[in-house]
Amino acid sequence: MNYLALGDSYTIGESVPLHDSFPYQVVQLLRKKGYEFSPPEIIAKTGWTTDELLSHLSAIKLLPSYQFVSLLIGVNNQYRKKPLDEYRQQFETLLKKSIRLAANQSSKVIVVSIPDWGVTPYAAGRDVKKISEEIDDFNLLNKSIALLHQANYIDITPGSREALTNKNLLANDGLHPSALEYARWANLLAQKIEAQLKG
C-alpha cells in the first residue's frame, strides 16, 4: 500500500532522522501490525506555505492514486502573516487535490492540525499569546474544511503545547517536534488508518 504525506517541515521531520518523521513512524507502526506498506512518499519542504505546496504539486508527477494521504500545512502562512482568507481558499484546494489523490475517497485523507510553535524557545521575545491565538484561527479553518469534505481530522495542537513544560517533546533546534512527539502523532494517524483497513 502507498501513503502520501503532504506538508512542510513538520512532515519532513526537521531536526530528526528521516525514519523518526511522523510519516515514517506511521508506516513502521502499520508494518508491525502486519500491513504491507511501501515507504511513505513525502512531498514537503521547510518553509512552505499553502501556495508553495500547491505550486509544487502542479509541477510534479505523482502516482495516479494512493491508499492514504495526509495533509499538514499552514504554520508558515501564519508565520509570514498571510491572510486567513487566502489560507482558506488554498487549503480547500489542497484538500480537494488530496481527496482526488486518494481515489476520490475522503475517508482515506487525514488532515493534521498545525502545532503551536508559540510554546517553543524559538518564540522567546515574541507575543506568544498572539501566536497561539493565530494558530487556533488557522486550525479552526482547516478543521471546518476537513469536516465539510468528510476527511479525517487529527488535532495534535493541545499535545504540542505540552512542550512548554516538557522539553523532551522538542528537537534540539528548540522549534520542531522531537521523535517522541512525532511518535504521538504517528500513533493517532496509524489508528485512523488501521480503522479504515479493518473497515
Mark where each language-model region is.
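Alpha-helical cap/lid subdomain in secreted, periplasmic
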Residues: 55-199
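Short N-terminal helix/helix-N-cap motif within the alpha/beta-hydrolase-1
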Residues: 14-15, 51, 80
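Residue-level detector of flexible, active-site-proximal loop/helix-junction positions
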Residues: 10, 47-49, 116, 160
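Acidic/histidine-rich helix-loop elements
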Residues: 15, 41-47, 85, 126, ...
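Serine-esterase "nucleophile elbow" of acetyl-processing enzymes
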Residues: 1-46, 56-64
